[in-house]
């Protein structure tokens, strides 16, 4: 089984990483004093790679991805995309959340159209309509284009959110437990759809999940976080299965259960969750939550607006 210690200082890079998280720490002030969420996190991501991040609640997974998205800044260290420091949200990175963040009074078509209008304001009406249709078709929602969020299922809402994110034409797609609220069948369907979209669009994907089986099916590498406070990357598992992946073939492979058991041992034996820990989730931040909802709901327009204020 191929694993690596992401904090090993002897690791060297042959060339500049596409996405580089370098010695990142995050500290929040609290009434009881400073609280260190992350400490010394290092991760290099190749262009086109699919990375899943897993760990117990409160280990800083969302905090880490918020720094990649630009919604939050590290207390120490740097996050760089193509060797450029990330200091704010931007159209090269787009997030999809578990709770969809769609505008409920607008149709699926109009929710995606907002993103297309933001990125391609100079294109003709016909060209914009073709782009919206393209992204809705990509996620299998052509027939539901005129339906509003309240008229479609949770899985379809998440498809709209993914289509809207893709319409921004990001280089990095950031997914924060996007399928966590879905039933098992819908979740598996969307996992297959996500892999298809990832392949066809040459995306780099960072995805938070609590589902080891989901991570083993989707990821090139599984990043496993230690517990907080002062969480860091404990180990990274290389997922060896050939692509395109077949779920039945993978689950019949003995290596699948070796990897699964290794990840389970990491999470529930070596880093068992302390139920008495006062911090069950990343520190709440109402201002950050508002920014995330706005960006999710309005796409690039909200990102551009927030970057200016």
Cite the ranges covered by each PLM segment.
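Hydrophobic anchor residue at the start of the ABC signature
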Residues: 162
């Amino acid at each position: 089984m191929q694993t690596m210690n992401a904090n090993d200082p002897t690791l060297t890079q042959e060339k500049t990483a596409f996405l580089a998280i370098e010695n990142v720490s995050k500290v929040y002030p609290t009434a009881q004093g400073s609280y260190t969420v992350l400490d010394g996190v290092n991760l290099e991501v190749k262009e086109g790679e699919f990375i899943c991040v897993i760990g117990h609640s409160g280990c800083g997974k969302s905090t880490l991805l918020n720094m990649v998205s630009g919604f939050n800044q590290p207390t120490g260290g740097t996050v760089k995309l193509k060797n450029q420091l990330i200091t704010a949200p931007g159209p090269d990175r787009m997030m999809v959340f578990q709770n969809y963040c769609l505008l409920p009074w607008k149709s699926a078509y109009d929710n995606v159209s907002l993103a297309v209008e933001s990125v391609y304001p100079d294109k003709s009406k016909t060209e914009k309509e073709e782009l919206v249709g393209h992204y809705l078709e990509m996620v299998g929602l052509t027939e539901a284009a005129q339906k509003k969020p309240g008229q479609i299922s949770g899985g379809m809402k998440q498809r709209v959110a993914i289509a809207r994110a893709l319409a921004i034409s990001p280089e990095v797609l950031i997914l924060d437990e996007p399928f966590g609220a879905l039933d098992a069948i819908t979740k598996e369907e969307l996992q297959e759809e996500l892999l298809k979209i990832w392949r066809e669009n040459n995306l780099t994907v960072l995805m938070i999940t609590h589902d080891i089986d989901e991570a083993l099916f989707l990821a090139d590498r599984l990043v496993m976080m230690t517990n907080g406070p002062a969480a860091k990357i404990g180990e990274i598992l290389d997922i060896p299965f050939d692509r395109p992946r077949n779920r039945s073939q993978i689950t019949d492979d003995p290596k699948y259960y070796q990897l699964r058991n290794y990840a389970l041992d990491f999470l529930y034996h070596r880093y068992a969750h302390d139920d008495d820990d006062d911090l069950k989730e990343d520190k709440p931040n109402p201002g950050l939550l508002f920014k995330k909802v706005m960006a999710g709901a309005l796409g690039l327009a909200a990102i551009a607006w927030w970057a200016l204020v």
